[in-house]
Amino acid sequence: MRLIAALALACLLVVPARAEVVSVPLPGASEPTQTFLWEAKAGKKVLIMIPGGEGHLGLAPGRTSLGGFYGSVLGPLAESALTSGTTHVVVFDSPHALPVGTTYPVSRAGADHLARIESVVRFYKARFGKPVWLMGHSNGAVSVAEFIRRNPDLVDGAIFSSSRSGVQVAPSVSFPVLFLHHQLDGCAGADPRSDLRLIDQLRAAGKRNVSFVWLRGGSPEQKSPCASGYHMFFGAEADAFKAIDAFITAYD
């Protein structure tokens, strides 16, 4: 009986993070920005993730689950059974597709796009009253870099995963920065050597709260190398969310 009671108590304590789509208004815009939120039970920080590709997921109010890369790499950050469970996770959804460009996705520096990121940052900072971190994956890393170049005081940390070549971060940025790449990433636009050179420049300028993590597990998929497999941490999801969680909680 005691064992049954203990198991029942454990089940009650391990409660999944609340998940929902939250609409964030943008003054002057005809439509809000849809976001997907995993709300941690004991959140200490907010992590807002800007997706790669064309940045448009098609989120709609009423949705309570999000799978794929988002559910397997980001969702666990709000789950105490898998990580510290102390991060509220937000996935940003552009209301329209953002052209990927050929050499640099200039759409990621567009006024409407950056204004939407700012409104989402301010919305969740007000909602939770916690430090807000930004994470960008692939093309989304460009969005994060462009945003913090203009609004460094609104951000408390940044994570660049599988980032597209061309991302720049100024040494004057005071908050912690993590770069995350898979060693076997076959996406031509995501050259980790670019980020390694950037880290060398940042450290040479005296920045110490910057780190680079290689992922080595996982497996490829028979799909586009920039939308699957190693680039999306397929099979290495646990290594990815553990690395992210360890970096974020190091700055609690």
Residue ranges and their predicted role:
Residues A19-A42:
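N-terminal cap/lid segment of alpha/beta-hydrolase-fold proteins
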Residues K41-A81:
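Short, surface-exposed "cap/lid" segments of acyl-processing enzymes
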Residues S72-V73, G101-R127:
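Alpha/beta-hydrolase active-site loop
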Residues L74-P99:
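Conserved alpha/beta-hydrolase
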Residues R122-S174:
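Primarily recognizes the serine-hydrolase "nucleophile elbow" in alpha/beta-hydrolase
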Residues V173, F179-H181:
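Short beta-strand/loop motif that positions the catalytic acidic residue
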Residues A188-R203:
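Short alpha-helix in the alpha/beta-hydrolase fold that links the catalytic acid
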Residues K207-D252:
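C-terminal catalytic histidine-bearing segment of alpha/beta-hydrolase fold enzymes
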